[in-house]
Curated annotation (Swiss-Prot):
Keywords: Fatty acid biosynthesis, Fatty acid metabolism, Flavoprotein, FMN, Lipid biosynthesis, Lipid metabolism, NADP, Oxidoreductase, Oxylipin biosynthesis
Organism: Oryza sativa subsp. japonica
Cofactor(s) the protein requires to work: FMN
Region named Disordered: 372-391
The keyword Manganese is assigned to this record: no
Record GO biological process: jasmonic acid biosynthetic process; oxylipin biosynthetic process
Protein name: Putative 12-oxophytodienoate reductase 6
Gene3D superfamilies associated with the record: Aldolase class I
EC number: 1.3.1.-
List of catalytic residues: Y194
Length: 391
């Protein structure tokens, strides 16, 4: 069966846009010199015991690494107040940096680029995760509405104006640490209802100081974080993830188009900014089928650099996005979680493993983490690049 798929793939390989090489145009020194356009999206996995990256993460990431591929880590905390889920990694201490180094080295040995996603949850937390049991911090003191899944979010404390520079500096120092750990760059997490987005969106920002009110004021904190991180490690090493259309964690904006456009405008001020990674609006159901709404086109046209689309893409939709010039690269989450050799499966148009959502956030170092099967068992060899798509 695999041989049949291989023959078919070789016949029409050039017709698979996801598996074409990508290099940033007009940037001869760019880090983004990729053999394909299938990215590992950042996904929280809750297996970094005591917030320290563990050796089993090296296997998880190298299973999904290919020569000339790009991986983004799970969300990684920038400070002691950044945590909102159990056993998520940090990049704020010497111990964290030293623990990341062998993981990053293992990914690099496979020939892949590795980006560290920098994260602060803000109010998406509870007192139990916070230092000394204090309230989580946010743009607001309004708590998140209970979600019906048993998650408890404590009432947050509104950050004072004079405290915000310290949070900005936490991101800067985390970026420095990530580079010291060997990462090729960082992705600032400005999406999915977490701290930066709590400031950006008008449903969760009720401030009356210079960080609230107008669109410019609401985005000020995020822009300061971007500027600080760029100043520390260089724009060529900094990307960002944004989700202006989403409504996660009670973070909704009354004008997502204006929000997204303003943020892209700020990114364009940094000539060599690594990439803009944006999440699609929620899926629509058309004729009984889930359909991506492709709401990111205005931002794609506006942004001057590499554009990454995410949000429910499959092989067909990803190929179309690249072929149409809608996105340069496509980030895959659950599909990549369940199919560690996803680029190879796309190349062969092979069947996919089904993911098990019951093991997404458990703490088992193997089950639901590194035990999803490859098409061929010999791909488990960490030093084998045969699961990379052919160029």
């Amino acid at each position: 069966m695999v041989q049949h798929h291989q023959a078919a793939a070789n016949d029409d390989h050039q017709a698979i846009p996801l598996l074409t090489p990508y290099k940033q145009a007009g940037r001869p020194g760019s880090k983004l010199d990729l053999s394909h356009r299938v990215l590992l999206a950042p996904m929280t996995r809750c297996r970094s015991y005591g917030n320290v990256p563990q050796p089993h993460a090296a296997l998880y990431y190298t299973q999904r690494a290919t020569r000339g591929g790009l991986l983004i880590t799970e969300a990684t905390g920038v400070s002691a107040t950044a945590q909102g889920y159990p056993e998520t990694p940090g990049v704020r201490t010497r111990e964290h940096v030293e623990a990341w180094k062998p993981i990053v080295d293992a990914v690099h040995r496979k020939g892949a680029l590795f980006i560290c996603q920098l994260w602060h949850v803000g109010r998406v937390s509870n007192n139990g995760f916070q230092p000394d049991g204090l309230a989580p911090i946010s743009s607001t003191d309004k708590a998140i509405t209970p979600d019906g899944y048993g998650m408890v979010y404590s009432k947050p404390r509104r950050l004072r104006t004079d405290e915000i520079p310290q949070i900005v500096d936490d991101f800067r120092l985390a970026a420095r640490n990530a580079v010291e750990a060997g990462f090729d760059g960082v992705e600032i997490h400005g999406a999915n209802g977490y701290l930066l987005e709590q400031f950006m969106k008008d449903s969760s920002n009720d401030r009356t100081d210079e960080y609230g009110g107008s669109l410019e004021n609401r985005c000020r904190f995020a822009v300061e974080v971007i500027d600080a991180v760029v100043g520390e490690i260089g724009a060529h090493s900094v990307g960002i993830r944004l989700s202006p259309f989403l409504d996660y964690m009670d973070c909704v904006d009354s004008d997502p188009e204006a929000l997204g456009s303003y943020m892209v405008e700020q990114l364009n001020k940094h000539e060599d900014f690594l990439y803009c990674h944006m999440v699609e609006p929620r899926m629509a159901i058309v004729d009984g089928r889930r359909q991506i709404q492709h709401g990111l086109l205005p931002f794609r046209k506006q942004f001057n650099g590499t554009f990454i689309a995410a949000g429910g893409y499959d092989r067909e939709e990803g190929n179309k996005a690249v072929a149409d010039g809608y996105a340069d690269l496509v980030a895959y989450g659950r599909l990549f979680l369940a199919n560690p050799d996803l680029p190879k499966r796309f190349e062969l148009d092979a069947p996919m493993n089904n993911y098990d959502r019951n093991t997404f956030y458990t703490q088992d170092p193997v089950v639901g983490y590194t035990d999803y099967p490859f098409l061929d068992e010999h791909h488990h060899d960490d030093d084998d690049d045969s699961n990379a798509p052919s160029a």
